[in-house]
Amino acid sequence: MTTFNEYPFLAELGIKAENNDGVFNGKWGGAGEIIKCLNPTNNKVIATVRGAAPEEYETCIQAMLAAKVKWALTPAPRRGEIVRLIGQAMREKIEPLSKLISLEMGKIYIEAKGEVQEFIDVCDYATGLSRSINGQVMPSERPNHILMETWNPLGLVGIITAFNFPCAVLGWNAAISMICGNVQLWKGASTTSLITLAVSKIIEKVLVENDVDPAVCCVLIGPGRTVGEQMIQDKRFGLISFTGSTEVGRRISSTVHGYFGKTILELGGNNAIVVAEDADIELVLRAVLFASVGTTGQRCTTCRRLFVHESLYDTILERLTKAYKTIKIGNPLEEGVLVGPLHTQSAVKEFTEGLEEIKKQGGKVVIGGNKLDISGGNFVEPTVVAIEHDAPIVKTELFVPILYIMKFKNLDDAFAWNNEVPQGLSSSLFTNNQKNIFKWLGPTGSDCGIVNVNVATNGAEIGGAFGGEKETGGGRESGSDSWKQYCRRSTNTINYGNTMPLSQGINFN
């Protein structure tokens, strides 16, 4: 039994109840296995998609190769205008698209709407960037010479995105990659196939209406073991951008770097908030609540570790427990709900098995810890656990709403505990002490790619570069100078004189 007819907004997005095409190479098709798209609120089928057959991969590549040169030669401001129009088209569909994200992914509606807005914001940012991407011009030591650099497209870019941000992460990558002059192949998570379809149809319409080869943005829906494997093995890609687990990212890294290809890897996070003794408790509580339970603990930047100074520990724990008791759990499309379901039943298993291991390692559940029986969906209670900082499980990432709380005496210890895990994505310090702030931001502070003060670990703005260090992968997406990763840099020396002087004063006469 399907739930398709309960959601009229699906038709607004061009989605059918059965056999939606899952391959786009300028034209829609799909000859592979049928994918059942589930609603995590009740685990009923929403609709079905026919995924890609292995042989359809090459049709996408050939279509991209055919579109590559013309798109690369299109002036960057014109490419930026196309991206602006994509953002505008997304803006016009923000309501039904946000509802679809809530329905298929499981995050609450207001967060889903924020995700679509993030895609729109990146398009706006990329549009402006299309008129300002540039290389440096540097003084030459030789007379009548110019030393400069140019940035050219990589050609083919592969974008593999995860279930938790099935719309925004495409925007981070595709909007920037497009203004840089690349053509892209997108493989979204199989469990969010309808979102992949809806976004792709919006992009396709803009490209066609503006006489751009729609193969500039191709799509393959299918499992990673087939579609993803074909992509990472293909040396024709100038870049593979992957968002997902550290385990899969490690394999992608070894494969792509094995043939000296380029990657952007956004992998696991094990993010911490450090609460100093002078912290503003009200700020702490608001930040921790959103950071730990937002998106049901399924953000890369979710706060998983909370280090609290001993003088504030009891107060923070008591008030945080009270706040957790007020959280409304349920259908993410219902107003007032703060926590929706986990995305899959396997995530529920990760939650229950993770708690068993936590207890074996001395952890004590302060609040939560239960699987919930709500409408047959993947619901669990957001959970707070008291545990030692060096318990082995604390160094792994459980992608569920479990928050570890730990007490410290010395701020230097808390800084060290923040850094002792293999991951290095996001971190935040709550303090009003200027010395501690700049120590936290400096070489002996946090070793993460995102280092905040008095804000949550999650909810990053698009203007900054997003990414982390260590086993988080080292890649950067979205803002700042992340655009450089989607380009090929060349250093140029131009002689406009009549002599041939050599650098470093060499005389080779």
Curated annotation (Swiss-Prot):
A molecular function (GO) term: aldehyde dehydrogenase (NAD+) activity
Active site: 266 (proton acceptor), 300 (nucleophile)
GO BP terms: aldehyde metabolic process
Site-annotated residues for Transition state stabilizer: 164
EC number: 1.2.1.3
InterPro entries: Ald_DH/histidinol_DH (IPR016161), Ald_DH_C (IPR016163), Ald_DH_CS_GLU (IPR029510), Ald_DH_N (IPR016162), Aldehyde_DH_dom (IPR015590), ALDH7A1-like (IPR044638)
Enzyme class, first EC level, given as a word: oxidoreductase
PANTHER family in alphabetical order: ALPHA-AMINOADIPIC SEMIALDEHYDE DEHYDROGENASE (PTHR43521:SF1)
Name of this chain's protein: Putative aldehyde dehydrogenase family 7 member A1 homolog
Organism the protein comes from: Dictyostelium discoideum (Social amoeba)
Highest classification ranks of the organism: Eukaryota, Amoebozoa, Evosea, Eumycetozoa, Dictyostelia
